[in-house]
Amino acid sequence: MRSSWDIRVTDTSLRDGSHHKRHQFTGEEVRAIVGALDHAGVPVIEVTHGDGLGGSSFNYGFSKVPEQELISIAVDTAKNAKIAFLMLPGLGIKDDIIVAQDNGASICRIATHCTEADVSIQHFGLARDRGLETVGFLMMAHSIAPEKLAKQARIMADAGCQCVYVVDSAGALVLEQVSDRVEALVQELGSDAQVGFHGHENLGLGVANSIAAVRAGAKQIDGSTRRFGAGAGNAPVEAFVGVCDKIGVKTGIDFFAIADAAEDVVRPAMPAECLLDRQALMMGYAGVYSSFLKHAERQAERYGVSSAELLVRAGKRKLVGGQEDQLIDIALELQRERL
């Protein structure tokens, strides 16, 4: 990390935003967004299908342009920013990591459910052997206690992960809950690995939670310009940078340039604004994986049921990423109850 940074920001608009865009990014959009973010000084830009390498499928939605092609475009466009990719073991495979690196990506971000860090061990080993920077995602971090989350972080760090993220996939964590988890990871990992935080806006706390994470010791923070992400979106990078400027935390990102990028480049690529509407609010309240939003809206329309109620029941069942197909079962259940 450069000495001019207190916090390294990763922009996930071109990965988490893919959920909101139903994975329909074009090469031209990726080129424009990467160029604008790079110009603003964003140090890391994540590019893949919303569900990571190999996510383009019937279950998750097909990409308009193959993700490896988009990674290559991003690498060719960025002058200073590093290009990162996300992969979920079992959805993506180890060969996908090799191809992404061959296309110029330099940061490998590996995500697992917060209780399943052990499935990432071989993938971290491969990434480190190939000289990639490594980041670990412990998703749905609200669903287990801080001390248990720290033990899972230790598994990732011992496998070669250089920064373990507390990932609030549902946007369900509230301030002190973020601080408690970040502090637990910082205490557990010490100098062995950094700690990061990835938030969502489903309770309107993306920026506030990110600042809480910074104050608790996080060194890497995710966000999406214009909140371009799943659910109500991620912590908006432009707002986070502005707050950091006001409290004296260095990000290396030009506030005015990132505000221009949000308004003039990212917004035109969005199908609509990411809103804190009823459905997104229910996800944060019930603790539902943020990428479920578009799937729930589709099944609610198909079966004539309430998408909000669908999401609340998904939360009660503690569904996790990869179980989107169970929304159909819940929709049918709701439909039967109405007969």
Swiss-Prot record:
Active site (record annotation): 19
Residues the UniProt record annotates as site (Transition state stabilizer): 15
GO MF term (any one): 4-hydroxy-2-oxovalerate aldolase activity
Catalytic activity of the protein: (S)-4-hydroxy-2-oxopentanoate = acetaldehyde + pyruvate
Domain Pyruvate carboxyltransferase: 7-259
Enzyme Commission code(s) on record: 4.1.3.39
Primary enzyme class: lyase
Binding, substrate: 15-16, 169, 198, 289
Any Pfam family: DmpG_comm
PANTHER family: 2-ISOPROPYLMALATE SYNTHASE 1, CHLOROPLASTIC-RELATED (PTHR10277:SF9), HOMOCITRATE SYNTHASE-RELATED (PTHR10277)
Signal peptide: none
Name under which the protein is recorded: 4-hydroxy-2-oxovalerate aldolase 3
GO biological process: catabolic process; L-leucine biosynthetic process
Keywords: Aromatic hydrocarbons catabolism, Lyase, Manganese, Metal-binding
Residues reported to bind Mn(2+): 16, 198, 200
Stored InterPro entries: 2-IPM_HCS-like (IPR050073), 4OH_2_O-val_aldolase (IPR017629), Aldolase_TIM (IPR013785), DmpG_comm (IPR012425), DRE_TIM_HOA (IPR035685), PYR_CT (IPR000891)
Family: Belongs to the 4-hydroxy-2-oxovalerate aldolase family.
